[in-house]
Each structure stands twice: as structure tokens, then as C-alpha cells.
Amino acid sequence: YKADKKKILTAMGAKQFYIWNSLNGKDFHNDLLYIQNFFISHKIVTGYNSNNYDKIMLILLLYNAKYVTPEGYHYKEKMNLTDFMFRHSQKCINFGNGYLYTLGINKSFNIPFTNYDIQKILYLDKSFTSLKQVAIILKWYRIQDLPIHYLANIDEDDIETIMDYNVNDDLITLTLKRTVKDEIDLRDDITSEFGI
């Protein structure tokens, strides 16, 4: 099953990256350079409710990349990159909308991508429709909650499980995007023409 899934993702051109640090600090995996290189050629990020979290975390990561050693140490903040990102992840979740503006990044940093938040484009944010609810409507084959508590320490054995969960959410978002493509295109045209 896992080998088949990897073949399918490869055929789709899917890219997966991760940054991880072991609790004892001896093991580290750093795809930061690959993430930076990815945004040289990929200028559009599509997500679901991505304006409120994913976009912010990506901007924070890319903005701070210049302060990170190859070993993953954020020398300006004097901590490991994973600890830095985790701290801001919690703040972003607790703060809610507008957290990005508290960081002062927008004015001094050229964001290398455009974010398309499908939830916002379809006005599903107004009805608080979650991606899980969308998956049910789409009759998705696998409705899944986060397999590991969001505050848990991540062991190396957990990485594949978390990445599989992320792929499932990405595929739901992609299916939604394809299902309502005409509506998204219409809204995009209206925005372009009337600035709405």
C-alpha cells in the first residue's frame, strides 16, 4: 500500500518536505533548503483555511531561513528551528486571524508565493465549514482526525503517519478544487474584473 501510494504521489509530481529534531537533539532532518528551492518555481499555494495558518507558518519559515544553520539552529532566537516554529504555531492558533501582522513581516519581506484559500474563495469560512465536513460531502474514502495530539513530541516513527495524514488532507482539498473549478474560475474572473 505504501509503495503504491508513493508511486502515485511521484506520478502526480507531489513534493513532500519536513523538518524534524529528535528530543535528545542528536538526530535532525532539515528540508529547509528544498522548501526554499521549491518556491523558486512554484508561485501558487492552494489550501483549505490556509490564510489562517499554513500561509502564516510558511511565511514565518521562509523569512527566518536566513537565520538557520544547516543543523537547524535558529541563531537569532537561540533555539532549534523546530522549537521556534512550534512556539509560533501555538501563538498563531491562540491568536487567530491577524497573527501574521503582529510579526511585522509583510512590510519587509517579499512573500515568494500567492496563497489561494479554497475555504475563503468559496465563502465556506463564513459558515465555519471544516475540511472534514467537505470530505463527508465529497464522499471521501477516509475521514481522519490528526493521528497524534498537536502538542505531542514527534518521534521519528511518527513522521510517516503525519505526512500520510497531510497527504489525505491535500487530496481532499485537490478534489474539492477540481469539483468546483468552474465556480472558483468565475469568482477569480469577478475579482480580476471588479476588484471584489
What function would you assign to each model-found segment?
Residues Y1-G13:
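Gly/Thr-rich phosphate-binding beta-strand-loop-beta motif of the actin/hexokinase/Hsp70
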Residues A11, Y48-S50, L146:
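Glycine-rich, histidine-containing beta strand-loop boundary motifs that form or position
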Residues T46, Q119-I196:
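Acidic, Mg2+-coordinating catalytic module of metal-dependent nucleases/exonucleases
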